[in-house]
Amino acid sequence: GSGSGKSAYGEKRILEAGEMTRYYIATMEVFGEEGRKKVERHKMLRQGKGFITIESPKDVGRVEKLEKTGNGKLTVLLECVSNLTANEMFGSSFGAELEPGRRTEALAEKICADIAKIDEAADFFAVITNEVGSDGEMYEKETLEYIRLLGLVNCRLAKMASEVVEVVYGIPVMKKGAEV
């Protein structure tokens, strides 16, 4: 969830990957003062760590600025899939001609294909996401469809990943892969 330490853990993993060109792909669209403060806080926390920031709230597969410098290797931190998914679902006309359930499937495929393009380019790739909808609350139809879409994307990304780590109150809990 929000404030769980996911970002700090992802950054730590990128830094541990060694001396490589470091990219941070930021997907958050800033709305209001709270959003601006969150972005500023994250920028401050990344300061001095050598990240090149690319703002890409949608269509992350079109990110073409990933250049390998130095030793010819690069790492990428993508933050955050939950924002990316919301931006693609609510701020894009992709699949608008499809009925809602089919659009959700098409969006999940698109988002995962876009992320796979980054994975192919990177020597080390960390993806930050959220799990939403497990609180048992009742939601509007559109929100339920977003929760379903994010769940599909997260499941597919977990299948693609060599490691899956849940960060709970700053504590990494290995779900898939080698021990942390």
Regions found by a protein language model. Give the residues of each.
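Conserved P-loop
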Residues: 1-68
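Short, glycine/serine-rich, charged loops/turns that create anion-binding
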Residues: 3, 29, 82, 132-136, ...
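Residue-level signal for inorganic ion chemistry
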Residues: 10, 42, 77, 130, ...
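Residue-level preference for the first positions of well-ordered beta-strands
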Residues: 21, 73-75, 124-126
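Helix-adjacent hinge/juxtasegments
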Residues: 49-106
